[in-house]
From Swiss-Prot:
DNA binds at residues 93, 112. HAMAP family: Fapy_DNA_glycosyl. Involved in base excision repair of DNA damaged by oxidation or by mutagenic agents. Acts as a DNA glycosylase that recognizes and removes damaged bases. Has a preference for oxidized purines, such as 7,8-dihydro-8-oxoguanine (8-oxoG). Has AP (apurinic/apyrimidinic) lyase activity and introduces nicks in the DNA strand. Cleaves the DNA backbone by beta-delta elimination to generate a single-strand break at the site of the removed base with both 3'- and 5'-phosphates. Monomer. A zinc finger (FPG-type) spans 240-274. The keyword DNA repair applies. It comes from Shouchella clausii (strain KSM-K16) (Alkalihalobacillus clausii). Its cofactor is Zn(2+). Keywords: DNA damage, DNA repair, DNA-binding, Glycosidase, Hydrolase, Lyase, Metal-binding, Multifunctional enzyme, Zinc, Zinc-finger. This is Formamidopyrimidine-DNA glycosylase.
Length: 276
């Protein structure tokens, strides 16, 4: 699933392609993707004539800011956007097409069909699901060491499980939680409430650093991820633990191990991240 660095990269690349384009029509081939409004024809009619003023991001969600509405889109496992001409061949996995007045098309393709779209009146998107219960952005002033300490002070959950919960801090998924915990020297099965202030400080720093470097590299293309221009990310070449089971740790040469934490495959170095 695309995490914050991938979604941010898609946002940046798409914005260059579709900003100020006006929607002439919309074709929805898989109505189940449209969650709000629940009437697909109304979804289409509301979008006609709307111009894309900006594209924002909230956690792992893309926010297409229009004249009167905000389209909230989640890519889920394998969703992707791309700009095409009407003569370009459509893949069988293309499920939503936004046709612009200049003749170009923004296409949404999704092999798994798990992606979702919600259309809200501008200003209402943050007080409605799915955005209403999201935590703070990791690059915001609200993301502090104290926030992590207070949020996890009484939890019995493993630190990895706690970080994956989007209600405290958003955008973190399997890849970047594993990487941040490695760089902070914290075992993923440590109870979150057992971390010291120094460990929280290191974790806070490594979350921000890891995400920043991943964005600079265009995200991680582990399976099918590409950005809005169809380009793969390069951060997978910098991963220290994720997807490196039985390979030597870059710091100490110990074999990377894989376990399951909270139902998620989890990679760590048993030497650099000692068990609790």
């Amino acid at each position: 699933m695309p995490e914050l660095p991938e979604v941010e990269t898609v946002r940046r690349t798409l914005l260059q392609l579709v900003k100020n384009k006006t929607i002439a029509d919309v074709d929805v081939g898989w109505p189940k993707m449209i969650k709000e409004p629940d009437d697909v024809e109304r979804f289409i009619q509301l979008l006609k004539g709307q111009t894309i003023e900006d594209i924002g991001r909230r956690g792992k969600f893309l926010l297409f800011v229009l004249n009167d509405y905000v389209l909230v889109s989640h890519l889920r496992m394998e969703g992707r956007y791309g700009l095409y001409q009407p003569t370009d061949e459509k893949t069988k996995h293309t499920h939503v097409v936004f046709s612009f007045t200049d003749g170009s098309e923004l296409r949404y393709a999704d092999v798994r069909k798990f992606g979702t779209m919600h259309l809200f009146a501008k200003g209402a998107e943050h007080v409605a699901m799915p955005l209403a219960q999201l935590g703070v952005e990791p690059f915001s002033e609200q993301f502090t060491v104290e926030l992590l300490e207070q949020a996890y002070a009484k939890t019995t959950r493993a630190i990895k499980t706690a970080l994956l919960d989007q209600k405290t801090v958003v955008g973190l998924g399997n890849i970047y939680v594993d990487e941040a915990l490695f760089h902070a020297g914290i075992h993923p099965e440590r109870t979150a409430s057992s971390l010291s202030k120094e460990e929280y400080h290191n974790l806070h720093k490594e979350i921000k650093r890891t995400l920043k470097e991943a964005i600079e590299a265009g995200g991680s293309s582990i399976k099918s991820y590409v950005n809005g221009q169809g380009e793969i990310g390069m951060f997978q070449q910098q991963l220290h633990v994720y997807g490196r089971k039985q390979q030597p740790c870059h710091h100490c040469d110990t074999a990377i191990e894989k376990t399951v934490v909270g139902g998620r495959g989890t990679h760590y170095c048993p030497n650099c991240q000692p068990r609790p």
